[in-house]
Amino acid sequence: MSEPLIVGIRHHSPACARLVKSLIESQRPRYVLIEGPADFNDRVDELFLAHQLPVAIYSYCQYQDGAAPGRGAWTPFAEFSPEWQALQAARRIQAQTYFIDLPCWAQSEEEDDSPDTQEESQTLLLRATRMDNSDTLWDHLFEDESQQTALPSALAHYFAQLRGDSPGDALNRQREAFMARWITWAMQQNNGDVLVVCGGWHAPAPVSYSHLTLPT
């Protein structure tokens, strides 16, 4: 595999969970990189304890100005979460597994008034398909086990339509640059294939694989 296999998913989608599990088991990559808080990597083994699902990672940071509210973020896992199935399948094949998303404490505090192109694209899709909401549309398009063989290409097309040529807002650009550095590092090891599991909105984003190193 000369390039990473980037699997864009919808969080908590059973269809995407099945797809991720199947791809990891069939492709047997050396590295499985998952959208999740990178500062939890040293403790990832805790997720393999005898938990009763659902479970979640909660990340929190308090700003130096004690009067200002802190920032928190949840990373939830259920049996039907693609990220959970990626963790389990990667462990079974003994792949090196890392979370690659920017920790909440490192995210920019700057306001961004970029237009929400994702919502605009979603509205156009709903209008074209005459569906009531995005959940109904998703179920209609993807949550059918008989569609599994065509699922990868269908997902790629769907998320490309949602993203279009939008660069994303400042936070998404920051997160995607961070994820790209992890992908670059894994590719530069030159000792096995790389499979990436991330939200579909991020999957079509242009990624440069040169002059980047492992985030610290």
Spans of model-derived segments:
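Beta-strand elements within well-structured catalytic alpha/beta cores of enzymes
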Residues: I9, R30-I34, I183, D193-G200
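Short active-site loop/helix that positions an aromatic residue
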Residues: A203-Y209
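A short acidic-Thr-Gly-centered motif at the start of a beta-strand
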Residues: M1, R181-N191
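Conserved small/polar residues in nucleotide/adenosyl-binding loops
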Residues: S210-T216
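Structured, acidic catalytic/metal-binding patches in enzyme active sites
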Residues: M1-Q161
